[in-house]
């Protein structure tokens, strides 16, 4: 199963980008041993439309254009379900074992995600009730994906 993060906005050079890349590389090393075929991050350009609904619609169209048939769509949204690390790992493991071709995680821009896009998601996840900057959400998601791989591998990184 291939993993893809579609993130609206660009992560500039700096500590957040370095940390995100570190977790992505760690996952690649471990994930391949677990049957995952890699983890990619694609940045979606932020819309320049004047009104929020138009921005969300443009960003949603760019996101949907990258969703492959049969892939599981997971949105990151403050209204989503808060999953513990072990539950998240178990879900990724189930999708892998069901031979889902890919899982696509979507991180919206400043205006959030178009409701129609949220409805297409098999799972909507939240990192708690707080609103987080998309740069932090990307790092947090990459860390949780890496942590999920360590849980599936029985690696001591996750000490619950």
UniProtKB/Swiss-Prot annotation:
Record-linked InterPro entries: Alpha/beta_knot_MTases (IPR029028), RlmH-like (IPR003742), tRNA_m1G_MTases_N (IPR029026)
Molecular-function annotations in GO: rRNA (pseudouridine-N3-)-methyltransferase activity
Claim: Metal-binding is one of the keywords in the record: no
Enzyme Commission no: 2.1.1.177
Localization per Swiss-Prot or TrEMBL: Cytoplasm
Keywords carried by this UniProt record: Cytoplasm, Methyltransferase, rRNA processing, S-adenosyl-L-methionine, Transferase
Class of enzymatic activity (EC top level): transferase
Ligand binding (S-adenosyl-L-methionine): 76, 108
GO CC terms of this entry: cytoplasm
Function (record text): Specifically methylates the pseudouridine at position 1915 (m3Psi1915) in 23S rRNA.
NCBIfam families associated with the record: PRK00103.2-3, PRK00103.2-5
Protein family per UniProt: Belongs to the RNA methyltransferase RlmH family.
Protein name, per record: Ribosomal RNA large subunit methyltransferase H
């Amino acid at each position: 199963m291939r993993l893809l993060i579609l993130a609206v906005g660009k992560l500039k050079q700096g500590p957040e980008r370095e940390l995100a890349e570190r977790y992505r590389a760690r996952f690649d090393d471990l994930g391949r041993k677990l049957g995952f075929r890699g983890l990619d991050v694609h940045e979606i350009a932020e819309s320049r439309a004047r009104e929020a609904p138009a921005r969300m619609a443009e960003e949603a169209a760019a996101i949907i254009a990258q969703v492959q048939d049969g892939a599981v769509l997971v949105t990151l949204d403050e209204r989503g379900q808060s999953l513990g690390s072990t539950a998240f790992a178990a879900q990724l493991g189930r999708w892998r074992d069901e031979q889902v071709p890919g899982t696509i995680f979507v991180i919206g821009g400043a205006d959030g995600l178009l409701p129609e896009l949220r409805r297409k998601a098999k799972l909507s996840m939240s990192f708690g009730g707080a609103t987080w900057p998309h740069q932090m959400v990307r790092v947090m998601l990459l860390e949780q994906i890496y942590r999920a791989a360590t849980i599936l591998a029985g690696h001591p990184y996750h000490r619950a």
